[in-house]
Amino acid sequence: IRIRILNGTSHMVLNYLHAGQVNIAFASDDQDPAVYDVRHCVDTHTIFVAAPDYPCDFTHAYSMEEIAAFPLILLERKASSRLYLEQYFQQHGVTIQPEIELGSHNLLISLARIGLGVACVTEEFSQSGLGRGVILPLRTDFSIPPRAVTMCTLQGVTPTSAAKRFMDFISESNKMAYDPGHSYHFTTG
């Protein structure tokens, strides 16, 4: 069995799927069911993090306006999670302008960790840094609605037996992967 993993935005990995470069794509939850067979994998939560010595108050519940005033470290504009974040803030009359834009979630954590600003990250993908205390979550007085990561295959295309087995493995693993009892997501009000 040959496994090839390609990384990219939801749009990019779905293009890989259409081009036949991959059998399965993991993407955000807004995919057309007429085009894709979609399996829910996990809900994700957006949080803001900073280095423990960053000049902010980790006990204060920040408003959207206060978060927007920080030097923000965000994913690049074409990332679906970035677009989702911007739309959410705009719906509440707040514009966000990042100081730093990156193409990698790991880089968001790395730059926040060294004190370059406040990063907007996916909580579920940041557990290592949060658990080790190299980044800390900022409390907010708002809660960004969760998003879903889905496993997509092309509608009408039967996955290979190996791909099907992998999909079943992922589906079973996801039932145990995230323990909400250890969430670092803090909101008030």
Question: Where do the protein language model's features map onto the residues?
Answer:
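Central regulatory/effector-binding core of bacterial HTH transcription factors
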Residues: 1-34, 102, 186
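Flexible hinge/capping segments at coil-to-helix
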Residues: 35-72
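Short beta-strand->loop
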Residues: 37-47, 132-146
